Structure formats: C-alpha cells, structure tokens
Design a protein with these regions (language model features):
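Aromatic-anchored glycine-rich loop motif in surface-exposed flexible loops
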Residues: 1-58, 68-86
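Extracellular structured ligand-interaction cores
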Residues: 9, 57-64, 163-171
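Glycine-centered flexibility motif
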Residues: 8, 55, 60, 186, ...
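Residue-identity detector for threonine
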Residues: 14-19, 28, 32, 50-51, ...
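Generic detector of intrinsically disordered, low-complexity, polar/charged segments
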Residues: 5-6, 52, 62, 137, ...
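An aromatic- and glycine-enriched ligand-binding surface/loop that stacks and positions planar moieties
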Residues: 41, 71-198
Length: 198
C-alpha cells in the first residue's frame, strides 16, 4: 500500500530470480494495489487470530491492511471516473471483521507496567498540591497517568501485554545496543508515510 501511495506504481516482482534482471516495468498504482490485495486475500485464512509471540502477523493485521487498500482503490477509481462503491463496501466489510471479532477493543482501564505509579512520578510534585478533583493545582491537568498514557509505555504496546487495541505492532528492543559494548549506539530507524494527494 505505501509503495503505491509513495511512488504511484512499482515494478511487481512475482517470481524469485537468481540472476540480475534489468528490464523491470513499472506497474500502475491500481495494479500495485490489486497485487497486494490478491496476495493478502490468498493468505488471510491461513493466519492465526492471535499469537503468543509479539510481532507475528495475525489475521486482523491483514484485514486492516485490506481495508486500507480497498479505500485507496476506491479513491483511485473515483478519481478516474469509475465506480468505487464495491471497493468501499469491501473496505467496510474488512473493518467490520476486525471490529466484530471480539478480539480487539478500546482500552478503558489503566493497565500494565506503570499503572500503579504515584503522582510524584508524573509531575515531580507532592500529592499535597493536588486539588480535590485530582488535578495538578497550577494547570488543571490530571495528575496521574491514564489509560492513553499506558498504551505507549515500554512493556505495554503489544496485544500479548494486555493491550487489546494493539493489532500488529512494530517491535522495539531498547537493550540491543548493549550487545556491542560501548562502541554501539542506538539506531533510530527512519519513519516514512504515504504522500498526501490533492
């Protein structure tokens, strides 16, 4: 999906090659989307609903991506004067599959590694400065963490950690740099997103 959004269309490599090849042809954005759709729809039923190991591909991740791909396909069809209704209906169907599965839901209560930390941790202030409605007296902000805060704490990001909003999370290892001693440094990967269309 992101390749289609970033570059419009890319060469589609559908077979493994062991020799150099220089005559790849660029596909259209629609062909790029359709290839991704076809590949994902072919594997969706082979994927587990959940896994014990964080970072592994699950069915809802594919359903989510198919939803996005069908929206993108619909936008492209509309821009080209085509009928986008079936693409949008497929997007709705895949989104409903995730929502209605009962596996994922919005978090409504504090959870995880830092749910019991006191207010001193959050604002480096004493509990004496709290108001009766448990806000920080000078700014009126909640003095304690909340469920939204918990979603992003180390050890809370994954479904396996109790985060029922997490479908498929990028895995971060904050300790890996230590394996090379003092010569290593943290490697922050680049983050990219799709282009915005006009």
């Amino acid at each position: 999906r992101n390749l289609g959004e970033l570059f419009g269309g890319v060469p589609l490599v559908t077979e493994i090659t062991s020799t150099p090849k220089y005559d790849y042809k660029r596909s259209t954005r629609m062909e790029t989307y359709q290839y991704a759709i076809d590949e994902m729809e072919n594997i969706i039923n082979d994927l587990p609903v959940t896994t014990a190991e964080a970072g592994r591909l699950v069915r809802a991740a594919v359903q989510h991506n198919l939803c996005q791909l069908y929206i993108d396909k619909g936008v492209l069809l509309e821009a080209e004067g085509g009928d986008a209704a079936s693409a949008y209906n497929k997007a709705i169907s895949y989104a409903n599959d995730v929502i209605d599965s009962g596996t994922y839901s919005l978090m409504t209560e504090r959870f995880g590694a830092r749910k019991n930390e006191g207010p001193e941790f959050y604002y480096a202030t004493s509990a004496v400065e709290q108001t009766a409605d448990r806000t920080y007296s000078s700014a009126g902000y909640p003095i304690e963490g909340n469920v939204y805060w918990d979603l992003f704490q180390v050890g809370n990001q994954d479904y396996q950690d109790g985060n029922t909003e997490a479908i498929w999370c990028a895995q971060s290892d904050y300790e890996v740099y230590k394996s090379d001693g003092s010569l290593a440094c943290l490697d922050y990967p680049a983050i990219y997103g799709p282009v915005f269309r006009d």
